Amino acid sequence: MQAPPSFYEGDTLEVAKKLLGQKLVHIVNGIKRSGIIVEVEAYKGPDDKAAHSYGGRRTDRTEVMFGAPGHAYVYLIYGMYHCFNVITAPVGTPQGVLIRALEPVDGIEEIKLARYNKTDITKAQYKNLTNGPGKLCRALGITLEERGVSLQSDTLHIELVPEEKHISSQYKITAGPRINIDYAEEAVHYPWRFYYEGHPFVSKK
């Protein structure tokens, strides 16, 4: 079952934690690629100095952050790596959750090809398929084309995992500072990164 629009409403930190254990799905050329979300970071503009929308900054890139919750915000870093975010909070409140890492589930062969251009990979390469925001976007074929797309779409959405299959019973949710935001002054220390402690696909321990 797809997460309904109401799933993305409410406090961004709570939505971030709710996203853990759910399945991010992207259909590419009719083939389902997916992964279980194991690591996220919350960004709470306009007061969060780490957020692209800090101070209410409104640009062509960030405009989607000011829109309705439950849409995709995709951007490039270093001019080459895509990052996928879920927009949260009410219209006009520019907040979102960065998906930092996944455990691959569906379309494994396509994911391997997308990441390594081959399907015969080592155990170390397998562990590196989706353990970072840029890696998971490449693996799932998420690009700037997906910016602004509703997560109610048939081709890009979050699937809710039934409680009996949910991995939250196997891993403890841990909170800590976000990664690679040295520019963000006091916001560097906000414990707004949430992840499954000990999960092999988490990007950093």
UniProtKB/Swiss-Prot annotation:
DNA repair found in the keyword field: yes
An MF annotation (GO) of this entry: alkylbase DNA N-glycosylase activity
Keyword tags: DNA damage, DNA repair, Hydrolase
EC class of the enzyme, as a word: hydrolase
Record-level GO BP terms: base-excision repair
Pfam families per record: Pur_DNA_glyco
Its EC number(s): 3.2.2.-
Cited HAMAP family: 3MGH
Protein name (database record): Putative 3-methyladenine DNA glycosylase
Organism listed in the record: Bacillus anthracis
